[in-house]
Each structure stands twice: as C-alpha cells, then as structure tokens.
Swiss-Prot record:
Coiled coil ranges: none
Entry function: Cleaved by the protease thrombin to yield monomers which, together with fibrinogen beta (FGB) and fibrinogen gamma (FGG), polymerize to form an insoluble fibrin matrix. Fibrin has a major function in hemostasis as one of the primary components of blood clots.
Annotated GO biological process: blood coagulation
Protein known as: Fibrinogen alpha chain
Lineage: Eukaryota, Metazoa, Chordata, Craniata, Vertebrata
GO CC terms: extracellular region
Alphabetical UniProt keywords: Blood coagulation, Coiled coil, Disulfide bond, Hemostasis, Secreted
Gene that encodes the chain: FGA
Principal localisation: secreted
Amino acid sequence: EDTGTFEEGHGGVR
C-alpha cells in the first residue's frame, strides 16, 4: 500500500 512518498519518509510503496 502506498502511504505517501519515500521522500516524505512515510515509506510509500508504489
């Protein structure tokens, strides 16, 4: 599940 972007530090997996 994408919970944001990696750059924001939320660990977004897309």
